[in-house]
């Protein structure tokens, strides 16, 4: 009788194990699929970020090159306009505002501090203004 109980327990255990594996395995597969998708999305995000950084770095290089080339073109036009058109007055010359060498080599425009006052008196303190 003991062998019969052992055999019945073994069969019941195998059935319970098979059922548990069937339902438990589905959740495990879902978890593994989600984990794989998460890792794939993280890798894509990292790749996108690297691509974005390289794009902006290349754009900055191109803008610097373009600014340098523009300065060279402007200096060339200013030199050639003054040498080819010497009789043209300074006011009529479109390239009269020649860039200084120090300005041409400077990558940034000079920054002036903002003023915290206006040119003349305004508002109630203004003198000499007509009142209607």
Curated annotation (Swiss-Prot):
Location in or out of the cell: Cell inner membrane
Disordered: region residues: 95-132
Cytoplasmic face residues: 22-132
Ranges annotated as spanning the membrane: 1-21
Effect of gene knockout: Deletion of the gene results in morphological aberration, such as branched shape, and cell division defects, such as filamentous growth, defects in DNA segregation and generation of chromosome-less cells. It also shows abnormal FtsZ ring formation and aberrant septum development. Deletion causes high sensitivities to various envelope stresses, loss of envelope stability, increased membrane permeability and causes growth defect under normal growth conditions. Loss of the gene results in aberrant cell size driven by the production of excess membrane phospholipids.
GO cellular component, one term: plasma membrane
Keywords from the UniProt entry: Cell cycle, Cell division, Cell inner membrane, Cell membrane, Cell shape, Membrane, Transmembrane, Transmembrane helix
Main location: membrane
The keyword Cell division is annotated on this UniProt entry: yes
Keyword Transmembrane helix: yes
GO BP annotations listed: cell division; regulation of cell shape
Alphabetical list of Pfam families matching this protein: ZapG-like
Topology class, membrane: Single-pass membrane protein
Family named by the database record: Belongs to the ZapG family.
Subunit organization: Forms homooligomers. Interacts with proteins of the divisome, such as FtsI and FtsQ, and of the elongasome, such as RodZ and RodA. Also interacts several other proteins, including the shape-determining proteins MreC and MreD, the N-acetylglucosaminyl transferase MurG and the lipopolysaccharide assembly protein LapA. It also copurifies with LapB and various proteins involved in LPS biosynthesis/transport and phospholipid biosynthesis.
Role played: Involved in cell division, cell envelope biogenesis and cell shape maintenance. Is a key regulator of cell envelope growth, playing a crucial role in coordinating cell width, elongation and division to maintain cell envelope integrity. Plays an important role in the lipopolysaccharide (LPS) assembly/transport. It may regulate LpxC levels and assist MsbA-mediated LPS transport.
Protein name, UniProt field: Z-ring associated protein G
Source species: Escherichia coli (strain K12)
């Amino acid at each position: 009788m003991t062998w019969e109980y052992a055999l019945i327990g073994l069969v019941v255990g195998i059935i319970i194990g098979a059922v548990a594996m069937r339902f438990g395995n589905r959740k495990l597969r879902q978890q593994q699929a989600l984990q794989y998708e998460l890792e794939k999305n993280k890798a894509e995000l990292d790749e996108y970020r690297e691509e974005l950084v390289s794009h902006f770095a290349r754009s900055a290089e191109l803008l610097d090159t373009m600014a340098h080339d523009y300065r060279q073109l402007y200096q060339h036009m200013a030199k050639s306009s003054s040498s080819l058109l010497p009789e043209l007055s300074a006011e009529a010359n479109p390239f009269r505002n020649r860039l200084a060498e120090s300005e041409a080599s400077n990558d940034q425009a000079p920054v002036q501090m903002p003023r915290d006052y206006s040119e003349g008196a305004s508002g109630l303190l203004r003198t000499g203004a007509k009142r209607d």
